[in-house]
Structure formats: C-alpha cells, structure tokens
C-alpha cells in the first residue's frame, strides 16, 4: 500500500518539481502515530526521500502526546540524516489557539529543534479573519495578533537557529529499528491498542 502511494503520488510530484526547479515540501496527514500512518498514508518514512524538504506537522500546545510525539520528529530526522537532506521542516502551532504567544511558540519550536528539525514553518497567516477563518485551526500568525509588532523577536530567533543547524554535518552512530512493519502485522481496523503499544 505504502509503496504504491509513494510511486503513484509522492515520487511523481517530486520528479515534476525537480524537472521544474521547484522544491517539494510539506507534510502528510496523520504522521503522528503508527496507527494513524497505517490508516492514512501507509507509513510516513518512505515518502520523505521523495521530498526536497521533508516535513511534519506539530499540532497543539503540548509535546510528546498523540498530537506531536517524539516518534514523529525522529522519523523525519532519521530520513533526513540517511538521505543527506539539508532541511527538516516542522509546521508548528496549528490548533494552539489565538492566545498562544511567544513563550509557548519558543517552547514548542525548541522541542522540535532539539529532536532534529532545522526549519520552522509557523502555521497559518490569514489576510482576513472574517467568517470561519478565525476558527480554522488557530493560531493565526499575522497582523491581527496584538503581539504582531514583536513577532520578529521569535521569527529572527528561529531563522538564526535554522541557519546554524543547517550548516553542519551531524554524526549519528545509533541505529533504532522502526516498528512500522510490526505495526502492520498487528493492525486491525478499529483496534488501535495493539499497534499503539509498540
């Protein structure tokens, strides 16, 4: 299933972007647990080699939970290291709420960077917050926020950190076998517990 998805979609988008001097980036849906990967994308890691800047999504105001686990970041980091990719992107702060300001953003961003991310992609900048837009997985990071005039403080911090962390070459001497194959053998629709215990 995963191989077919990669060949029928991810690799074709990657090849098209490559042929047109574009960088394919973004994240796949439901990459945050083994169970959700099987249900939505088969497995996250096989897609990442066919992205110029592979990425993940870190939702909410918490770390190390189902909505943003260490597993998610380390899967990305592993492929970036193995394939020599220069960047590991994380879309941060979605579903954090409109009142999620600098200290929370720094905490979440630093957590992701410690685990291997080196490109911060803040979630959502709306030109207008009319209608349903103000409720679209906030936070909106733009002029509508009362702290917008000071946003440069955190933006510059992550820009500098991203640059520094993208300049070196990491030496990784630890091998961890990823459990997605075992997860597939335990998978049963509607029964997440066995898979999530891995």
Regions of interest found by a model, annotated:
Residues 1-198:
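Carbohydrate-binding surfaces of carbohydrate-active enzymes
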């Amino acid at each position: 299933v995963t191989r077919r998805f990669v060949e029928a979609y991810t690799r074709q988008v990657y090849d098209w972007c490559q042929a047109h001097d574009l960088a394919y980036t973004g994240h796949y849906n439901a990459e945050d647990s083994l169970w959700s990967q099987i249900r939505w994308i088969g497995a996250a890691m096989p897609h990442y080699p066919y992205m110029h800047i592979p990425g993940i999504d870190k939702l909410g105001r918490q770390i190390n939970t189902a909505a943003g686990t260490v597993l998610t970041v380390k899967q990305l980091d592993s492929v970036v290291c193995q394939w020599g990719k220069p960047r590991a992107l994380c879309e941060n702060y979605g579903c954090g709420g409109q009142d999620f300001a600098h200290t929370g953003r720094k905490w979440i961003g630093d957590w992701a960077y410690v685990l291997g991310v080196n490109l911060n992609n803040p979630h959502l900048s709306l030109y207008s917050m009319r209608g349903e837009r103000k409720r679209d997985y906030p936070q909106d990071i733009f002029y509508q926020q009362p702290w917008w005039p000071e946003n440069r403080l955190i933006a510059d911090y992550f820009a500098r950190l991203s640059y520094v962390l993208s300049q070196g070459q990491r030496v990784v001497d630890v091998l961890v076998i990823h459990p997605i194959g075992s997860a597939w053998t335990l998978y049963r629709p509607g029964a997440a517990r066995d898979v999530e215990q891995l």
